[in-house]
C-alpha cells in the first residue's frame, strides 16, 4: 500500500488532525515533531472556511448539544470543566461575562503573581488526573493563553505528540467534547 496523499485544501493543523485520526502510523512519520499544544494553539489562525471541514474530520455533530445554547463555547467550556472534574483547576471568578469569567486557579490576577501554594496544588491535582483529563485541562489553558504556557503547565505532563493525544482522547471517549471546545472557541 502506498502513502496516503496529503489532503488538499486543508490548513496544516487540520491536515495533521485528519491524518492522525485516519492513519496514525503515517501521521507519526510525516509529522513526527508535531505536538498537541501546536494543534490547539493553531485554533486562532483557523478561519470559518478552514473550520468548515472540522466536523467531517472529527466525525462530529457540532449542532449537538452546545449549539443549542446562545453562547455555545461558554456552555461547552463549563460542561467540560464540570463533566471532567476540572473544578480544582478552574474557577468562575473572572471580571468578564460568560466564558471570560472562567480562569485557572493558582494565580492572583489582581496582583499579577503566582500564588506558590495554590499553584503547587494546581499542578498536583493536574498530575493526578488521567491523561485525557490532563489533555482537556491543557487545551483550556492553551486556548485561554492563546499560545503555549509556562505558568500553569510548567513541570507537568503536556508535551504529547498530536497522534498520541488524539488517540488518547478518542479512547477515553472525550474527543467529541475536546472537538467542540476547539471548534466553538471564539477567543478569550
Task: Locate the predicted segments by residue.
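Extended, charge-biased low-complexity segments
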Residues: 1-127, 134, 145-188
Amino acid at each position: 500500500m502506498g502513502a496516503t496523499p496529503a489532503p488538499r485544501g486543508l490548513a496544516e493543523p487540520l491536515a495533521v488532525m485528519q491524518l492522525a485520526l485516519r492513519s496514525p502510523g503515517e501521521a507519526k512519520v510525516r509529522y513526527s515533531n508535531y505536538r498537541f499544544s501546536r494543534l490547539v494553539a493553531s485554533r486562532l489562525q483557523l478561519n470559518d472556511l478552514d473550520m468548515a471541514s472540522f466536523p467531517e474530520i472529527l466525525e462530529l455533530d457540532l449542532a449537538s448539544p452546545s449549539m443549542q445554547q446562545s453562547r455555545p463555547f461558554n456552555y461547552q467550556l463549563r460542561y467540560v470543566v464540570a463533566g471532567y472534574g476540572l473544578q480544582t483547576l478552574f474557577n468562575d471568578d473572572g471580571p468578564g461575562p460568560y466564558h471570560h469569567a472562567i480562569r485557572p486557579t493558582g494565580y492572583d490576577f489582581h496582583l499579577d503573581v503566582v500564588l506558590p501554594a495554590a499553584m503547587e496544588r494546581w499542578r498536583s491535582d493536574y498530575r493526578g488526573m488521567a491523561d485525557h483529563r490532563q489533555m482537556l485541562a491543557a487545551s483550556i489553558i492553551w486556548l485561554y493563553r492563546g499560545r503555549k504556557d509556562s505558568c500553569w503547565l510548567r513541570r507537568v505532563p503536556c508535551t504529547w505528540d498530536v497522534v498520541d493525544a488524539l488517540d488518547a482522547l478518542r479512547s477515553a471517549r472525550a474527543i467529541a467534547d475536546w472537538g467542540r471546545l476547539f471548534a466553538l472557541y471564539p477567543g478569550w
